[in-house]
Amino acid sequence: MPVDARTPNEKTVAPLAAASAFVESLRKPTHILVAISGGSDSTGLLLALQEAKAADDDGLRLSAVTVDHALRPESADEARKVAMLCAELGIPHTTRRWDGPKPASGLSEASRLARYRLIADVAREIGADLVVSGHTIGDQRETVAMRAARSGGSDNLGLSGMADAVLYDAHLWIMRPFLACERQVIRDYVSSRSRHWLDDPSNENIRYERVRVRQTLPHSPIALDDSTAVRRQMLSERTAVFLRERAQVFHAALARLADDDVNPDLPEFRHGLAALIAALGGRSYFPAASSMERVLRFLKTGETGRMTVGRVLLDRRRDGLYIFREQRNLPELQIESSGQAVWDDRFLVKNGSDFPINVAAGRVGTAAQAAALFPSAPSGVVKPAMAGLPQIAAAAEGWVSTPEVAITPRLAPFDLFLPRFDLELANAIANLFGRPAYPQPPV
């Protein structure tokens, strides 16, 4: 049963108006891939985009994709019904099935990752420029409520909710034109076009956190505040400027901030430090608020010393703050010829040689090598920083250096999912780590 958990200050938009404004905003020509499950939101999005396209057909193509997660007996039939709808509308459609074993725990997250991967595969195959999904203002309320339950502080960046666009796998923009649309209004729109939608019974299963939150929202409405998202983006942009001007990163393994720039009271410093910790530690998320509070207490003393957080070591010295991967739990892996793998969630290693290679933590080199890699860094910092770099060996021989092996820094906080809020910050980090900039959204 639909619920209305609106608060007085929320602004909502009609589905067709949202789709029309979205289409008008896009750079053209463009090819949109619509992710459609058959539910009311994604069905409404497909219909509204087709109607908007009819009014503005200049260089716009539509295709659709359905992911069959194979978690319910009826899912294959539901995917066929979506394919039939798309055929009636004249929209090319692809179904992809999530095959293979399903995890006993963490099923929701595994399903989400599989869904994005399969959708991205289809986008690549058909040459789509972007993907759109049917997330609504109701989904936004649920997201904010779940994040507020974990940390309700005013500095919780999660309270900004979902971004209207997110970059997937550093190459594909997934956009959400319906984030200001109410589900019931979308359903009314679908019905007015004499179309129907499919109801997924898992949307009523209280085993899932989102369902439980959805059921409580009518009694405890969440007020969405657009200014929260604006503040987050402004903080990210100011932090990007701070890092470009003040931070140094050597070989994607060692960061340095001069002592004058270590200012725990400055929001840009705090946010930038959290981003550097996540990137140098190979973590998908910034450190938890409690961890950052511990770091800031340490830095506010102004004393020299060391502490660890998020798999990195912070070394406060008289000349500044050094940040590098701690020497624990560094992995070893083997990569076959022509294969590739991510090492320590920090480096992508591609083996273009004719033989298997082993990748392990680096050895401490000579003083000359250390000085060349990390100029001006103290010896007590250089040695552990060098040990955090990947080193390559032929599987059947000793350590080797080969031009046929490519090592590229990976940015764990941004490479898989990058909200548009954080694009400028991510590009500042990418520049420091010797990576090209992330692509801009197609608007």
Curated annotation (Swiss-Prot):
Its EC number is 6.3.4.19. CDD domains: TilS_N. Pfam families: ATP_bind_3. It comes from the Bacteria. ATP binds at residues 37-42. It is found in: Cytoplasm. Keywords: ATP-binding, Cytoplasm, Ligase, Nucleotide-binding, tRNA processing. One of its GO terms (biological process) is tRNA modification. Ligates lysine onto the cytidine present at position 34 of the AUA codon-specific tRNA(Ile) that contains the anticodon CAU, in an ATP-dependent manner. Cytidine is converted to lysidine, thus changing the amino acid specificity of the tRNA from methionine to isoleucine. The N-terminal region contains the highly conserved SGGXDS motif, predicted to be a P-loop motif involved in ATP binding. This is tRNA(Ile)-lysidine synthase.
